[in-house]
Structure formats: C-alpha cells, structure tokens
Amino acid sequence: MSEVFDLTCDLISRPSVTPEDAGCQAMIAARLERVGFTCEHLHYGSVANLWATHGQGAPVLVLLGHTDVVPPGPIEAWTSDPFIPQRREGKLYGRGAADMKGSVAAFVIAAERFLVAHAGHPGTLAILLTSDEEGQAIDGVRKVAETLRQRGQGIDWCLTGEPSSSKRLGDLLRVGRRGSLSATLHVKGVQGHVAYPHQARNPIHLAVPALAALTARHWDDGDESFPSTSLQISNIHAGTGANNVIPGALEVAFNLRYNPHWSAPRLESEIVALLDQHGLDYTLHWHRSGEPFYTPEGKLRRIAREVLERFSGAPPEESTGGGTSDARFIAPLGAQCIEIGPVNASIHQVDEHVCLADLEALPDLYQLLIERLLADH
C-alpha cells in the first residue's frame, strides 16, 4: 500500500496494551535517528517514553502521541484478531488503528518527508511518545513534562494526534479541554438487621440527601468556548449482597469535568462544604487528572484551520469538548495546544478501524502543518 499503511500495520501488530510499549518506540526511534533526530528514552517505572528532537532553538513544535492501547476485550468478539492488522472494505482494522497508532505512523512519515525538503529548518521539531496515556497517566507525559520543566525546555506549539474528527477527517479542531477531577466518597454507617433499623445507621439513607444536592448543583453556565461544568456519579457500592442487612459503609465515585471558571482546589472546597452540611461521617479521596486548558485565537489556530479546510473541504468546528488528553500536561509549560486526528467513531470498541483514505491523507496533513509553522517561520 504505502509507507504510512505499512508502518501503522507494524505498530498494530505489536500488542502494546497499556502500559506496555512492545518495542514500538525503539522501532520509531531507529527510523527517526536515521533522518537526524536525537532520541532520548525516558523510562519511569514500567512506562516507556520517547523524546526525539531535530533542530534547535525556538520556535519548538511538539508532535504528541501514545504507543499504548486499551485492552481488546474478548478476542472472539472481533471479526479478526485485534493485533493482526487486516484491510477490509476500505478500512484498516486492529486495536490502535484510530487511537492512535495511525496518527503516530503519520507523524513519523510527515517528519521524514519534512526533513527531506527542510533539513536546515528554523526552530525545533520534536516528537513525544508515551506508553501511559490509556492507563494511569502518571509515569508518562505527566512525568516527562516535569523533566522538561526542570530542564527549562520551552514549547511553543503542541499538536496531539488524538482521533478528534467526528464524521470526516479534519471536520473538528480541538482547541482546548475541560479539566477532570475524580473523587471517592466513603460514608460510614452502622451495620445491622433491616428489622431493627434503630440499632443501625444506614449510610445509604444518610448520604442520599447529600448526593441529591451534589447532582442538583448548578456549577456554571459555561461560555462561548467551554460547556458548563458537569458532575456525574459513576459508581455506588454498599451492602453484603443480602437483602436483610443494613450496610455499614457506602462508597460513591464521581467525576467533574470543569471549565476554566473553576480550579480543582476550589471545586474540592465547594464539595466538602456541601457534604459538611449533611452531618455525614465520611472521608473523601481526590484524584486530579488535569486542569482545563485553552488555545486562544492566533497563528496556530489560524494555520490549523486553513490546513483542515483544505483537506476536509469546509472550515472545521473548533471545540473544547470530549474527554482528557495528554496535552493537559504540556499546556502548563506555556505551549499552545491543538488536537487533530482521524475519525473517532470506533475507538475503544470491538473492530476498531481507520478509513484507509484518511490514513493516507494524515501524513500530508501533518507535513503541511509542520511546514506552515516551521519552514515558513
């Protein structure tokens, strides 16, 4: 087929279920070194990270991606083996085809082609890959960003290859993301027989008014760039499984997706104050996944918009929706961040796939972005 097809197939065939890399980064580094990149392997715990750079000085453009994939689930549910790439009816099937080994392959091909034409380009072209995006995201880009900060490494622009397109390649330009804050609430009660409630304290009954207040809370109205903040309860667990036992404890997990009107500490303070109004005996454990970020109108967005319109035939929607991405760790370094990638309709699903026409177009799209940002600088 083509270079990008062959490289994507090679990556898919490596079962890099998070946090495994399965040799993806070593293979990519060998290719990049052949065209003049300096490659540094940063291993933290069981996580592999690759920091590859070409050129020097500003401006610094980072192509950000991940080599890990989510587990495929039951193999028998797939039409073909998720780690044996298969071409069918104009699509390439396999775990990671869309999220995001196709984009990683396109990054590599685009960088190689760019350097053939612009070996002495201004500034720095960097590629940052991790095997910890789909997992805990602790020893991946989060840790690499800390290392880069300590070194004083500046980053001007970051292009993440997450599958951001909705219906067709290039129809959506991600220009920011909401923050994500998770919590696990433990409410203590007193276990007892359901026939003798006066001898027990039912933590479910005690917590219901507080949970109702949490879910009814109107956090904000959002703005022209971000939707309103949302709180969703994701898990509730209590009881022994028997229907005649009042549980002694309740565990509730919830998550907030929040816009820049809030910070994680402010949200935590608000929720603690609300819970304290209900007299619960509780503990609360927080996990901050990342603060919101936003790339304002400027050179990066303008060029990305022009390039996407050229490839998709219409101006892209500019959005801050969706989940989180590793760009949340790069933005605090002062970088303007955007996300452009293939259609996301099949990601994390059985029979994940990428349209072959989109896969073939991705290297050209990324190469044009690199040229507009660095070669035309």
Curated annotation (Swiss-Prot):
Record carries keyword Metal-binding: yes
Known EC number: 3.5.1.18
Record has Hydrolase as a keyword: yes
Transmembrane feature ranges: none
Record-listed Zn(2+) 2 binding positions: D99, E134, H348
Gene3D superfamilies named among the record's database cross-references: Zn peptidases (3.40.630.10)
Binding site for Zn(2+) 1: H66, D99, E162
Reaction(s) catalysed by this chain's protein: N-succinyl-(2S,6S)-2,6-diaminopimelate + H2O = (2S,6S)-2,6-diaminopimelate + succinate
Gene Ontology BP annotations: diaminopimelate biosynthetic process; L-arginine biosynthetic process; lysine biosynthetic process via diaminopimelate
Pathway(s) served: Amino-acid biosynthesis; L-lysine biosynthesis via DAP pathway; LL-2,6-diaminopimelate from (S)-tetrahydrodipicolinate (succinylase route): step 3/3
Keyword terms: Amino-acid biosynthesis, Cobalt, Diaminopimelate biosynthesis, Hydrolase, Lysine biosynthesis, Metal-binding, Zinc
GO molecular function, a single term: zinc ion binding
Record text on cofactor binding: Binds 2 Zn(2+) or Co(2+) ions per subunit.
Superkingdom, natural source: Bacteria
Enzyme class: hydrolase
Membership in a protein family: Belongs to the peptidase M20A family. DapE subfamily.
Role according to the record: Catalyzes the hydrolysis of N-succinyl-L,L-diaminopimelic acid (SDAP), forming succinate and LL-2,6-diaminopimelate (DAP), an intermediate involved in the bacterial biosynthesis of lysine and meso-diaminopimelic acid, an essential component of bacterial cell walls.
Oligomeric and partner information: Homodimer.
Protein's recorded name: Succinyl-diaminopimelate desuccinylase
